Design a protein with these regions (language model features):
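Short, glycine/charged-enriched hinge/interface segments at domain edges or termini
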Residues: 2-13, 70-210
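Short, low-complexity N-terminal leaders and the immediately following helix N-cap/first helix
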Residues: 1-83
Length: 210
């Protein structure tokens, strides 16, 4: 650019490029990176200040993935049908109130905690209700069932102590749901930046003014 002696650019030095000026301004700013603890229902679109570590396993117990019947796989007849008496019921939030023994079946619903067995041997398989017949309070089970079918294991999705969300990320609805699933009620986020713009001059007016 040619500098004339009678124009406003005639300061006798090198002109600063706009991008260089912006970079110099940004480098001179002292931005305070403050954090705050907020509830999950206020966390959408906020920036996470620290990693989120799972406080508990997901699922928190062995549970059923379907509506059906909890059994011990080793009770099944490999070549023919098996009949087992139904001795109780387990629902989500209402686990079986007794021990499930070998040779027994328990009516179980999706999300219900798997019953406990005797001598540290727990039932390990869930039959879908569509795959069995019910006769005289007994389930008739066809051959061909796989061990461990339709059972979700403790910590199968998330193991307690693992990092599930990384600091610096912008929180989406699914991230907040994940934090809730792992036991978090509050999240540490960056406080929003506060920026002020000053306009000066006698010619400055509010929008709509003449």
């Amino acid at each position: 650019m040619v500098q004339l002696t009678s124009d406003c650019f005639a300061f006798g030095g090198k002109l600063t490029r706009i991008d260089e000026a912006l970079q110099a301004i940004l480098e001179s700013l002292a931005i305070k990176k403050e954090t705050e603890q907020i509830s999950l229902n206020r966390a959408l679109n906020r920036f996470l200040a620290e990693d989120v570590i799972a406080l508990e396993n997901v699922p928190s117990d062995n549970n059923s993935a379907v509506d059906g019947y909890s059994i011990f796989f080793d009770d099944l007849n490999e070549t023919g049908s098996t009949a087992l008496p139904v001795i109780g019921k387990a629902a989500a939030g209402r686990p079986l109130n007794c021990i499930q023994k070998r040779g027994e079946a328990v009516r179980i619903f999706t999300g219900a905690v798997m019953p406990h067995g005797a001598n540290s041997e727990d039932p390990d398989t869930v039959l879908m209700q569509e795959d069995i017949q019910l006769e005289n309070e007994k389930v008739i089970i066809p051959p061909g069932i796989k061990r461990g079918s339709n059972r979700r294991l403790l910590g199968e999705d998330i193991v307690a102590g693992t990092r599930v969300l990384e600091a610096g990320m912008r929180l989406r609805p699914q991230d907040i749901g994940l934090a809730a699933a792992t036991g978090k009620a509050l999240l540490s986020v960056r406080k929003p930046l506060r920026v002020a713009v000053f306009s000066t001059g006698d010619e400055v007016t509010d929008p709509g003014e003449e």
